[in-house]
Amino acid sequence: MATRASIKISDSDGNFIANIYHHYDGYPEGLGQKLIDICDSGKLVNGLSIGRSSKQFNGFTDLACSIVFELKEHSGDGRVYLNTEDDYGKCGEDYLYEIVENPAMRQSPLVLVENMNGETELVQDILDRVNA
């Protein structure tokens, strides 16, 4: 059975950027870890620099595009879809993720998850408990 999830991406003011529906492996040790890995794979900057030696995201919306790209690239046909803001939490999801821009620009965003019990916490805190 599929472990479905949706990922809402919001800026630091709470404005909606994207809602990504992910049909399989939506549990924190799978999708949650992947989201953290994507967010940590580059540096958030305001304007790309020439001759850079590491991956950069030109602002938070560029990171949001990279999240969609990375999830879709590794999922094969189907499985990952863009939905409307109103669809968030209405597609039979087991987990609801939210990636929120950190108000302190240049820091990794907050990656949160709401579990089946309606509790919201940082994905990293869950992973730390599971791996302890």
For each of these PLM feature ranges, what is it?
Residues 37-132:
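Low-complexity intrinsically disordered segments
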Residues 30-38:
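An exposed acidic His-Trp-rich patch
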Residues 1-27, 31:
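Short, extreme N-terminal segment that most often corresponds to the first beta-strand
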